[in-house]
Amino acid sequence: MADWFASPLKTCTHVCDFPTLAGDPSQEITCCDSMKNKLNDSRKVLLVSCSVSFNGSFYGGNRNVRGQLQISMLEDDGVCRPIGYVPIGGYLYHNDYGYYEGEKTFNLDIESQYLKKDEDYNRKFIVSVLNENGLDSLCDLKVFIVHALRIKV
């Protein structure tokens, strides 16, 4: 991977808004290098990492909420597999709003095949909320995802 260090760094950013966490919600996002027809030669793309941060709130009294934010990636064999989890949770004694937040970076280092100059690099991801206890319609979550890519001509 040392030969990638001189390659330009590019990011791909997404925001997933979950206004309610009832029913194990999920959203699909696509990581893209947006380099179609911008270079004169074919290129390779290295998907370096996926950084995830989130914040959210929940309402109620004597509430214990917890779950997992699952990030999955559609792999080359067509199967969507988890790349990692970030715990969500909090406890609240009084009838009020509680808050939770978290962050994590997943190192991927996935190298693409050579791409023609007239095609974009694309990789699908699924952002899912897994309910372990109490995540419901009185809970919300906003997730921020940044993919780091390196482009090599």
From Swiss-Prot:
Could you tell me where this protein is found in the cell?
A: Host nucleus; Host cytoplasm
Question: Cross-referenced InterPro entries, in alphabetical order?
Answer: Nanovirus_C8
Q: Name one GO cellular component term.
A: host cell nucleus
Sorted UniProt keywords: Host cytoplasm, Host nucleus
Primary location recorded for the protein, binned into one broad class: host cell
Q: Which Pfam families match?
A: Nanovirus_C8
Q: What is the stated purpose of this protein?
A: Putative nuclear shuttle protein.
Q: Which family does it belong to?
A: Belongs to the nanoviridae nuclear shuttle protein family.
Q: What is this protein called?
A: Putative nuclear shuttle protein
Per the UniProt record, the source organism is Milk vetch dwarf virus (isolate N)
The encoding gene is DNA-N
